[in-house]
Amino acid sequence: MKNIIAIIWDFDKTLIDGYMQDPIFKDYNVNPHEFWTEVNALPKKYKEEQHVKVNPDTIYLNQFIRYAQSGKFEGLNNAKLKSYGERQNFYAGIPAIFKHTKEMLKNDPVCEEYNIKVEHYIVSTGFDEGIRGTELMNDVENIWGWELIEHEEHKIINEIG
């Protein structure tokens, strides 16, 4: 008998009201509409210019790196990305539902007998560090998001991990 109930969550617009990048845009005074308009044009641009098909859900990561390297996101590194986790606007009841679902089964005698438990996982095209910096992490088993590699010398985001 399997004893783990795995709950898999998306992050943006599922757990939070908006996008995890919103506080970054605000801090760096970058217009989110303009940023996403630029990003949404990239798949067509690369298809026409280089005959390359890019993933429209993740091409924004390259744009974030370009902005960091050009100074628009000056000093943006993994530590800063993690700190933005504290500024995410969770929907009402989140993160309490993470704790509640785990505790609920601990108090059930049948679940105790069979060691049935709930585990929470987050799958996102967002920044792993941004999620890692949230208050959810005490109740999340794992995250599948994007890791960014920092430039060794300049300590800003530089590559997709």
What are these regions (language model features)?
Residues 2-153:
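Alpha-helical substrate-recognition element adjacent to the catalytic core
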Residues 152-161:
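A recognition module on extended beta-rich or small alphabeta surfaces enriched in W/G with H and D/E
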